[in-house]
């Protein structure tokens, strides 16, 4: 188990090709001076300064998690206290998950007690700069009933003046297995963080403060049979943001504060069935509704609204997997996605897997990814543009993996080529003054990723990974070379 409060540092070390930014001892923040930008293979990293992550999708139990107005993930909301494990798909996954899954997908699978009993864990840590992190978790399993309750409090003064960060929140999940084949569960997560941004050393800020509340709740009914399984689920995410954009030395304090309320709700259904030997067919449908309101609240009582907008997405998809021979599997899928502003997008994907002797496998895949423009890009703040079209890319990938020595040794190598268009960037307005969001950017990336791990015994293991990335049009927060190596020790309570 990780002692980090956020899942991002763990992914930074263990996933080749993934990179996220950070700014201090603890916390990422939002808006001006924020970090927590994420990229996979150079997708998701901002093409220009001050743009958020929008090309990489974060999920919790398969449900998309992003700010309803801005369309970007909130890094401080993805805490290890709720995570049983984190699944990462490198490369486009839009055929299953839709918009934003261009560079890949991070899926946080929430905790659940698997065996009967009661387990309680308390973690307390302290460090320099007045840093404290605490977490308490209680998990129960009694017959068909299960529950998980977690609370945490973390704070730091920061390594610079005016860089304090404080966060507290809780997570609860209840589940009940009606039968061996049907189960239901629901959960809720609420976190509150207060952050301060001091600006850069050369360009400091005064009173650049944030008070952010994020919440999510979901409900799912699942079925699991020998030849079919599926789920019907509902989720609702919300956020309340209060931001003082601050001022620079010699300037005047702002006479207003930025406020926003955003929401995202959705209903998802899928069913997977084995029609005959070596076959798996999955069909599914999604409905998403997202949006909110943003305004500047002035001290004299009046307010100026910058956005009050909601949009909808409806999609259906199918994925077909078939063993053609003992050594060959075909996987093909397609999604039709309708957005209430930008219209319909068709997303195909196809792949082949070659099963070789000695637990070796070669995979070849071609997949399309896309991202719809956000409400911020279309309707909020100059240079907004309501005529924007979706960003699109194609990813071509070849991979090799193998497990040896009773699975104690594992290694893999991926090579990929990505080509995309319609990247949304700010350029001079061709029909007027100022800047305008336009579909003028291009993506052409290629690279390689390698990973290796070895389990000496139940106590000791080692792992390493490396990624190389070439970008014809470089973006921020996407390093060319990334290397990690680690030694793991786990025994009893240690």
Question: Which residues are covered by each model-predicted region?
Answer:
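Transmembrane beta-strands of outer-membrane beta-barrel pores
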Residues: 124-128, 142-144, 153-157, 190-194, ...
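Membrane-embedded beta-barrel scaffold of Gram-negative outer-membrane proteins
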Residues: 144-145, 227, 231-245, 292-293, ...
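Extracytoplasmic beta-strand/coil segments of soluble accessory domains associated
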Residues: 11-63
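Repeated loop/turn-to-beta-strand initiation elements of outer-membrane beta-barrel proteins
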Residues: 144-148, 181-186, 225-231, 278-281, ...
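Flexible loop and strand-edge segments within Gram-negative outer membrane beta-barrel domains
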Residues: 156-163, 167, 181-264, 303, ...
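Gram-negative outer-membrane beta-barrel transporters
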Residues: 323-326, 415-419, 438-494
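Short strand-turn segments of transmembrane beta-barrel domains in outer membranes
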Residues: 105, 109-140, 150-151, 156-163
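Short acidic/polar hinge/loop motifs at secondary-structure boundaries
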Residues: 8-12, 55-56, 63-90, 433
